[in-house]
């Protein structure tokens, strides 16, 4: 996994007396993240004095309106009553990991073998268009749409 690779690289650099206080992992499947996103996430880490920062974006569909269906497709218990008659704007905002930016204190990463230092991790909120994670052809088409939009 990525953490094992990062630790291996840090170990190899240590043999050459090269040390880094922080690492940043930029996934290649998130090509629309920009320099401004990266710089702002670093600023957040320094401001919060935290051990890790992970990028997120708002979900398009609120999970309070999502459920599984029984074999008979009945919707009797599909949505809990408190949320049934609310507009989406009145529901709490939910966020998801977007895979674009992971910042972490190198020592804490090595000690905890994770990019998520739970008691000292903060979210860097990115907009949807910078959060496209290319895992499918549809994602690639969406990324190309935004690239064309930015370049016009």
Locations of regions flagged by a protein language model:
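Hydrophobic helical membrane-anchoring modules
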Residues: 124-125, 129-152
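Short acidic donor-binding loop at the edge of a beta-strand
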Residues: 14-24
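Conserved core of the sugar-phosphate nucleotidyltransferase
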Residues: 1-8, 22, 31-120, 125
């Amino acid at each position: 996994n990525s953490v094992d690779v990062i630790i291996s690289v840090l170990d190899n650099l240590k043999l050459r007396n090269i040390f880094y206080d922080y690492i940043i992992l930029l996934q290649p499947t998130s090509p629309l993240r920009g320099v401004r996103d990266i710089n702002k996430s670093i600023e957040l880490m320094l401001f919060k004095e935290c051990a890790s920062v992970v990028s997120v974006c708002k979900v398009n569909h609120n999970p309070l309106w999502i459920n599984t269906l029984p074999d008979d497709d009945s919707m009797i218990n599909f949505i809990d009553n408190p949320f049934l008659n609310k507009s989406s704007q009145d529901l709490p905002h939910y966020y998801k990991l977007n895979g674009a930016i992971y910042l972490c204190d190198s020592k804490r990463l090595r000690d905890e073998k994770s990019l998520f230092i739970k008691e000292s991790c903060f979210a860097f909120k990115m907009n949807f268009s910078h959060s496209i994670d290319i895992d499918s052809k549809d994602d690639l088409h969406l990324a190309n749409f935004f690239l064309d939009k930015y370049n016009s």
